[in-house]
Design a protein with these regions (language model features):
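DNA breakage-rejoining catalytic core of tyrosine-based enzymes
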Residues: 1-2, 37, 43, 49-71
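Phosphate-binding active sites in nucleotide-utilizing proteins
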Residues: 32
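Active-site/binding-pocket entry motifs
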Residues: 46-48, 75-76, 84, 140
Length: 174
């Protein structure tokens, strides 16, 4: 996994140590993490909307905000990830992607579309920047669809991981 898809490792580690769903893991921002208190605030989820052909930022499955505690291992993983992201931002320079959401109103409903733009692209006025935790080296978000593909690949290639799904990581957290 480390050689084939390194960006998939962080979300898998977060899900393993904190018991998050795939969309919640991808929707986690640095503002949701308190490293001092060792807790995460889970308040959003990312999902793909096949009708709109867009990734949508929305509420969690139960539409409730919750706090999840974690230990020293995940604390160290997150500190290392933050350091790596800052290094990548410097290396990629203006080609580093920034992540944004746009509020959309349709028939008395509000939802948020996800976008990512390189530093060279002009940012529309209605885009708001968001600081996700699970990023690819170029700064773009590691999406649930990619993680599902990685897990499917692992289940086919590794003995003992047949029928492995990302959701099973939720059951490792107690």
């Amino acid at each position: 996994l480390e050689k084939k898809n390194p960006p998939a490792i962080l979300p898998i580690q977060i899900a393993y140590y904190a018991g998050l769903r795939i969309g919640e893991t991808c929707g986690l921002t640095w503002q949701d993490i308190n490293l001092e208190e060792q807790c995460l605030t889970i308040k959003r989820s990312i999902r793909y909307d096949g009708i709109k052909h867009k990734n949508i930022i929305g509420p969690t499955k139960r539409k409730k905000v919750r706090i999840v505690d974690f230990g020293d291992t995940l604390t160290e993983i997150l500190k290392a990830a933050r350091k790596e992201q800052l290094k990548n931002r410097m290396q990629y320079g203006e080609l580093y992607h920034r992540n944004y959401y746009k509020e959309v109103h349709v028939k008395n409903r509000v939802y948020y579309e996800y976008y990512h733009l390189a530093g060279t692209q002009e940012v529309p006025a209605d885009y708001k920047e968001i600081s996700f935790v699970c990023l690819r080296p170029d700064g773009s978000l590691e999406l649930p669809s990619t993680l599902s593909i990685v897990c499917r690949s692992v289940s086919k290639k590794l003995e003992g991981f047949e029928d492995f799904h990302f959701h099973q990581l939720r059951h490792t957290y107690t």
